[in-house]
Amino acid sequence: MDTLLEAIDVCNVDGFCFGNYTNEEAGTGCTVIVAPEGATGGVDVRGGAPASRETDLLRPENTVDTVHAVCLSGGSAFGLEAASGVARELESRGIGLPVGPTQVPIVCSSCIFDLAFGDPTVRPDIEAGIAAVREALDHTPATLEQGNVGAGTGATVGKLMGPATCMKAGLGAAAVALGPVKVGAVVSVNACGNVVDPFTGEWVAGMRVAADSDQIVDMELAAFAAAGSMQMPLDRTNTTISCIVTNVELTKAQATKVSQMAADAYAHAIRPTHTTNDGDTIYTLASGKLGAQASAAVPLDLLGMLAVRALQTAIVNGAKTAKTSHGIPGAAK
């Protein structure tokens, strides 16, 4: 299958623009995925502690079927404010659901907990959301920057035993093309678990043996060894949030199924994952730029497999490109 797949930049998935807002000093930021002409959306919320906006709107039985942006943000629940800035900027550009006197942009959002990483009093706000949209639409980067940027600025992994032995992670992106079908993924990797490269089996980032060590320990084995005495000091402070994008035309139900299938990428690249202390959320946006006839010929299961491939690669990229920051070591040299 690898001989048929072409690795492309996520910015080459038709119908979408991407932008970051980064506050490196405060250790937080946000990332926006904009669909200027709208996209059909779906979502899978699998973690036990999500911070999100407009996820109920994406349920297949609900009325609105067009999404104009997804905002991935730091700041925990405070970071949901950035989505209001995204909506405000899109409205000013005439992007949104027509409602008579104006347009209402449909903006979904999820946040990671990064308040313990940098300055907990600084969170992505309305101005941050506006800045991210302006980067996406005014500068239209050909390549989405990864690592310590956007929603990945304050992301960390390997936190089973607390912050002293965790590692830096960040924003990751990847995309693949199979003929005219394009599927991409953007992810903020802020997991309780370790990141493993599913293609090699090697640890990329995660819990270290000690604060002064670079050796990564298998968190699952550590948990088994600790048995009932294990305590998790960072309850509800972990979330891996992501957005799948595709040029295929989908219904809301189909987009939701792609999100559900894409959750396999978390299991492939993060160990453990979907814990009660993670708020794992996966959005899917379908632009339909491939066209109705060509899209109808694409099996939904195939699309889901492509989403898994893109997302697991993006997760690994988010860990590999993260640099040491605020005293927490990263895998990028």
Question: Each predicted region: which residue ranges?
Answer:
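A structural signal for small-residue-enriched, beta-sheet-centric alpha/beta enzyme cores
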Residues: D2-A77, E81-S84, S92-K333
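Acidic/His-rich segments in extracytoplasmic proteins that coordinate ligands and/or metal ions
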Residues: A87
